[in-house]
């Protein structure tokens, strides 16, 4: 089976219960299946907390975090440091052989500045699959933060959904975006099982899909188009359903290419 990229988001990193559930599901899945898995993560909540402690402003533009030069070191520390090693610690606790990486390791993702107005925010494009294929072939679980580095050595904060898409393209992998919500919800708060670009545009125009979810849906649509295959948005809260999800059963919203 082709590899599966699991992108973790939301308050997952803040919740011990959620991490316990997730890694228990990952462990049991890996024992029963040969499918190579890759975890990609951001850590927005962690960064927000840190900014608050340091009395630094949090500014978002169209759902993307503005990252000034004087904040990129702090954000790199939170994402590539604390968030990455926290996930690594959970993997080790569950006897999973994991490796903590960033987008730049092995040139897995090519990163360029996205927009000068956003500061150190990067645009992710597929890179070389060599390092990750070597690790997956040896049975490791790569845990990859959404910090990238440009060709001229600038640290960049990359939207984790977009980072996961670029990695999926690099590896020819399937992609699941795991978040706090059980998928995309309609105006009545009901889960939408399948979503096309046309349906998404309608819901965005009607103001039903807003803020960070717009970025998530657009990232999933972009991923589905780029990869030429469906992408799932689902919740980590339903831990009992995660093994089925890892096997290709939709439990949230399936975004169609």
UniProtKB/Swiss-Prot annotation:
Residues in coiled coil: none
Superkingdom of source: Bacteria
Keyword Acetylation: no
GO molecular function: acetylglutamate kinase activity; ATP binding
Reaction catalysed by this enzyme: N-acetyl-L-glutamate + ATP = N-acetyl-L-glutamyl 5-phosphate + ADP
Main localisation: cytoplasm
SUPFAM superfamilies reported in the protein's UniProt record: Carbamate kinase-like
Coiled coil among keywords: no
Pfam families: AA_kinase
Binding-site list for substrate: 43-44, 65, 157
Keywords: Amino-acid biosynthesis, Arginine biosynthesis, ATP-binding, Cytoplasm, Kinase, Nucleotide-binding, Transferase
Cell compartments where the protein resides: Cytoplasm
Pathway: Amino-acid biosynthesis; L-arginine biosynthesis; N(2)-acetyl-L-ornithine from L-glutamate: step 2/4
Entry GO terms, CC: cytoplasm
Site (Transition state stabilizer): 7, 216
Residues that hold ATP according to the record: 180-185, 208-210
Known EC number: 2.7.2.8
Assembly: Homodimer.
Family: Belongs to the acetylglutamate kinase family. ArgB subfamily.
Function noted in UniProt: Catalyzes the ATP-dependent phosphorylation of N-acetyl-L-glutamate.
Protein name: Acetylglutamate kinase
Species of origin: Serratia proteamaculans (strain 568)
């Amino acid at each position: 089976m082709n590899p599966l990229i699991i992108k973790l988001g939301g308050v997952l990193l803040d919740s011990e219960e959620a991490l316990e559930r997730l890694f228990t599901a990952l462990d049991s899945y890996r024992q029963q299946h040969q499918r190579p898995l890759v975890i990609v993560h951001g850590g927005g909540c962690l960064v927000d907390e840190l900014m608050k402690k340091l009395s630094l402003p949090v500014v978002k533009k169209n759902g993307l975090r503005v990252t000034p030069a004087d904040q990129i070191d702090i954000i790199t520390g939170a994402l590539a440091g604390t968030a990455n090693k926290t996930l690594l610690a959970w993997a080790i606790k569950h006897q999973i052989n994991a490796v903590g990486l960033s987008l730049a390791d092995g040139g897995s993702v090519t990163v360029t500045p996205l927009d000068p107005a956003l500061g150190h925010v990067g645009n992710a494009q597929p890179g070389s699959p060599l390092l990750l294929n070597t690790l997956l072939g040896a049975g490791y679980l790569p845990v990859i933060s959404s910090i990238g580095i440009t060709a001229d050595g600038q640290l960049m904060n990359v939207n984790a959904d977009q980072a996961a898409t670029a990695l999926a393209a690099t590896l020819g992998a399937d992609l699941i975006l795991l978040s706090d919500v059980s998928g995309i919800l309609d105006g009545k708060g009901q889960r939408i099982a399948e979503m096309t670009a046309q349906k998404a545009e309608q819901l965005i125009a009607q103001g039903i899909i807003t803020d960070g979810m717009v970025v998530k849906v657009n990232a999933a649509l972009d991923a589905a188009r780029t990869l030429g295959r469906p992408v799932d948005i689902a919740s980590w809260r339903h831990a009992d359903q995660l093994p089925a999800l890892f096997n290709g059963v939709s439990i949230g919203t399936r975004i169609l290419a």
